[in-house]
Regions:
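Repeated scaffold domains used in trafficking and secretory/extracellular systems
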Residues: 18-26, 76-85, 125-137, 181-188, ...
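Hydrophobic beta-strand positions that form the internal "hydrophobic ladder"
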Residues: 33-34, 92, 140-142, 230-231, ...
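Blade-level signature of beta-propeller repeat domains, shared across WD40, Kelch, NHL, RCC1
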Residues: 143-170, 497-529
Length: 529
């Protein structure tokens, strides 16, 4: 196994990056620590959704108050509701939880040991913990949401207050607090939103440390240029450019942010595709107009904007700009939209698009590739990998699944020679199963050259002449031998000792690896041979 890559530079770094969008924070004057709860968000967008299986973006970060260095970073399956440092012990109590959307209020009481980094989930049964407060060294006051809202229209405004005592909270074991200790009558409970004051607090703490808090999140696309510049698309930014010096050259802002970057055929500009989600405005849901813009790489000037009328995904490969509509609610089979410098033409019918079945972004594509169903009225079934010819015709190459009767979801891909390497997951009625995520290399006649199985879905992949690089939503980064699929190296992504996850990666022309992280940073990694 060869050496793992080394992070030699971090672009877009800043304090509190690890926790994403902050929800609340508390300062402990005794230990001079700051605890922050936040959310990195999902690792899916309207163009692709399979990477969100087994993912949670909820985080608890514990930072040094003076230097703002992240000392601990803990994943939570539920949003963070409350934080409280123990008055004496190196222990942080965290209340988490949410309503499941139909019946139950679920969550955990987490006890984070700041000396050993052990995390204890202390409740015997899942309960949303709205508030935690230390009354003394031995007494912890909890406010818990009702178990459910069955025949209780006031459940969302109620809480059950209980005081749990332990002689030594540092010795509490997993699932040690039973339901009998939490039994209490329901009372009105206020659930304030602390996000605005938390943002102000983090900005003030950063300013006091001589730093700036920016709140960057989720780098969805990253590309390296021949001259050493780095392009990226991320939340709130349609596209940005970083100079070889490490300074940000320009940025084009957007209400949602860019999700795709595709270098234009002229070599001097890049196409950027923005996310558009429905948002409630008053009593109605509204969706902003799609935004697909071509941006000059040198100056960041928006040169043109396409108006497809519906949200679409950019399809790479070839000289034309090709869009695949994402209007999944339409009853008509969708067609590709093909643009060149002088005109727009309708492409072949490809069926309706959904983010789980049809995501198939192919890097280094010599021609456009899409996933299409054999029945355009049921496009998610019996999908084939198809190529779009120069004349706009669609040629089916081989079935997406090489196992008969097995349904597979889409994922990232790369073309290597006369073959495609692509990642995905296998459908199962009970969700993603162990070994249900894969990377496979197949010849253009459909023959399987090799496959590599894992438990977590891939978020991104790319390749050079002999290695396939795969990022997973678990935070893993794996290099596979392009010839036989064996593991060259495997590592867990970290920045400053704190784990992170990569929604995007790209092999730069200079040979190093660019990794876009879920917390808004771009890692430049050297690949030692």
């Amino acid at each position: 196994m060869t050496s793992v890559p080394i992070v030699r530079r971090v672009l877009g770094d800043g304090p509190f990056a690890e926790i994403g969008e902050p929800a609340l924070a508390v300062i402990d004057d005794r230990s001079r620590m700051v605890a922050v709860g936040g959310d990195l968000g999902a690792v899916q967008w309207n163009g692709t959704g399979t990477a969100d299986s087994r993912w949670t973006g909820h985080r608890i970060g514990v930072y040094e108050r003076d230097a703002l260095r992240c000392r601990h970073l803990v994943r939570s399956w539920y949003p963070v509701r409350s934080l409280a440092f123990h008055p004496v012990l190196p222990l942080l109590a965290v209340g988490t939880g949410r309503y499941d959307g139909g019946y139950s209020f679920e969550g955990e009481l987490l006890l984070i040991h700041l000396d050993s980094r052990n995390v204890v989930s202390a409740l015997q049964h899942p309960r949303e913990v709205l508030s935690v407060e230390w009354r003394s060294e031995t007494a912890l006051r909890l406010v818990l949401a009702p178990c459910d809202d069955w025949e209780n229209p006031h459940a969302h405004e109620q809480g059950h207050t209980a005081v749990v005592t332990r002689a030594d909270w540092g010795a509490v074991e997993q699932r040690a607090i039973g339901a009998e200790e939490l039994a209490a009558p329901a009372e009105p409970a206020v659930q304030p939103d602390h996000s605005a004051e938390t943002r102000r607090l983090l900005a003030d703490l950063a300013d006091a440390a001589g730093q700036q808090w920016s709140g960057r999140r989720r780098v969805w696309a990253v590309e390296g240029m021949e001259d050493g510049r780095v392009l990226a698309a991320l939340d709130g930014v349609l596209a940005e450019s970083w100079l070889p010096s490490g300074d940000r050259q320009w940025a084009v802002e957007d209400e949602e942010g860019g999700r795709q970057l595709v270098l234009a055929s002229d070599g001097t500009s890049v196409w950027a595709n923005a996310e558009r989600r429905s948002r409630r405005k008053g009593r109605h849901w509204e969706t902003s107009a799609p935004r697909l813009a071509r941006i000059a790489i040198d100056a960041g000037q928006v040169l043109e904007t396409l108006s497809p009328g519906v949200c679409a995904v950019l399809i790479t490969g070839g000289q034309r700009t090709i869009l695949r509509p994402m209007d999944g609610g339409s009853k008509r089979p969708a067609r590709l939209m093909m643009y060149d410098l002088d005109s727009t033409v309708d492409g072949p019918e490809v069926g309706r698009y959904d983010l789980f079945n049809h995501g198939f972004a192919v890097r280094s594509a010599s021609r456009p590739y899409v996933l299409v169903g054999t029945d355009l009225d049921k496009p998610h079934k019996d999908k084939w990998i198809a190529a779009v010819g120069a004349d706009g015709t669609l040629r089916r190459l081989f079935p997406h699944s090489w196992v008969p009767q097995e349904h597979r979801f889409g994922g990232p891909a790369v073309e290597i020679g006369q073959s495609l390497v692509y990642a995905g997951t296998v459908h199962h009625g009970h969700g993603l199963q162990p070994g249900g995520a894969y990377v496979v290399r197949r010849s253009l006649n459909g023959a399987v050259q090799w496959q590599y199985r894992t438990d977590h879905p891939a978020t991104a992949l790319d390749a050079d002449e002999d290695t396939v690089y795969v990022a997973y939503n678990s935070g893993a980064l794996t290099a596979l031998d392009a010839d036989n699929g064996s593991v060259r190296w495997h590592t867990e992504l970290e920045v400053g000792g704190a784990p992170t996850t990569a929604p995007s990666l790209a092999v730069a022309p200079q040979g190093h690896l660019l990794v876009g992280t879920v917390d808004g940073r771009i890692l430049e990694c050297s690949l030692r041979r």
